[in-house]
Amino acid sequence: VRNAINESVLKQQIIFICAMHDIGKAHPVFQGRDVETNEMLRGYELNQETVSTMFRHEEYAEEMIKRTHLFGFDADKRSEMIIRQIISLHHQKEKERKKEDFMPIKSKIVERWSNIQKYIYNYIKEIFPCEKIEFPNIVFDDPEVGFVVENGILGILIASDWIASNNEAMDNKTIKDFSDVGQYLDWKQKVVTAFLFGENLTRSAFPDVR
């Protein structure tokens, strides 16, 4: 794979996948779980009441990527399938839910939510730009290589999600405390690096090929 794709391009693509993996949270049912947020949504007539507690944002994100015409996800079909699988598995949940547990956005607010989703996606793409995602043929032609690539990216995604959700790894500073996004990201990188160093994880690496 290393010889089939530029390493810096692959890094950008993995960063982008990690950055957008929670796009499925841009849904009124998920956001409405928090009482305060639901009241705010109600004020803008963007809320959607439901009795279902089975909504899974990672599965909804997979559905969103299927409908690429809605927000312009840029990948060839084969690579798109891999990315959908990675994102749908990042919480390792058993799929024992019924079809009705998947909550479509109601027609009267679906267009406005679609615009919100596009805005979030485009904002992520602006901060973490990457070329069209087209994994090399060897990923699809060799099952062992495909397995390693898919699970390698999934592992990076799960680790990054854990770090971003870890109160010990992240301080309380938000983007509002900085003059621009670049300064914010530079600061967070320093904070996370210090945390990982303290956990003896900065020297971790894949074993050499034998």
Language-model regions, residue ranges each:
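N-terminal pre-P-loop "Q-motif" helix
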Residues: 199-210
